[in-house]
Amino acid sequence: IAKTLVAIAIPVVTSSIIFSLTNLIDAITIQNRLDGVISNNLDLIKSIYATQIAEAHVLDADLKDFLYGAYTLSLDFKNLIPSITTTLGVSAIPALSAAYAVKDKRALKSSVESVLRVGMIISLASGIGMGVLAEPILRMFYENGKSAPAISIAAPIMAAYGYTIFLMAISQPMTNMLQAVGKANVPVKSLTVGAVVKVVANYIFIGIP
């Protein structure tokens, strides 16, 4: 039993570590690339965000922090939908484990399809709403605060998250279900590939003004 638990626990823990490290590396690479692109294209960046910079009275030395702060406004809402769909995967673990133990493929298929169907409905509907209403939502929370000038920068980012959030919203339930049927090593591989792709994409695309 101990060996089985360890065999299951190691991939699960590894997945969590990779996810946390990816978020950390993501934050570091974004800020580093922002610093580089601003240093090399200061006048262009200032012309693109002239209105917001003037409204917030941003100095050249603070421009990177201002733009990164605008990006983080959208992050406040990014995890709302995945946090809901994650509970679907967790709630399905007992049924999936039981069906897998007795090799009931029909029950296994039914459980997986139900979780994915409900997860897609929730994530697509709420994601589209998040995309369409990105700026009104941000204004509702930040209109009267110091972050108000950054709303027009954060809104397109939040909209992009909204339209693609179903991918993130489905990934966690799928991870839970794979772990429930003894395939915990699969999420480790996919997370590793995703982390590498994300870091490379950050480096390439953030460097483009």
Language model regions located:
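Helix-loop junctions and terminal segments of transmembrane helices
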Residues: 74, 85-102, 175
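Interfacial segments at transmembrane-helix termini and the short loops linking adjacent helices
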Residues: 131-165
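Alpha-helical transmembrane segments of polytopic membrane transporters and translocases
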Residues: 43-59, 65-85, 117-121
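Interhelical loop/hinge segments that connect adjacent transmembrane helices in multipass membrane
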Residues: 1-16, 37
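Residue-level recognition of pore/gate-forming positions within transmembrane alpha-helices
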Residues: 76-79, 114, 127, 136, ...
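Interfacial transmembrane-helix starts/ends
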Residues: 2, 6, 72, 92, ...
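Membrane-interface junctions at transmembrane-helix termini in multi-pass inner-membrane proteins
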Residues: 163-193, 203
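Residues that define the loop-to-transmembrane-helix transition and helix capping
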Residues: 69, 155, 184-185
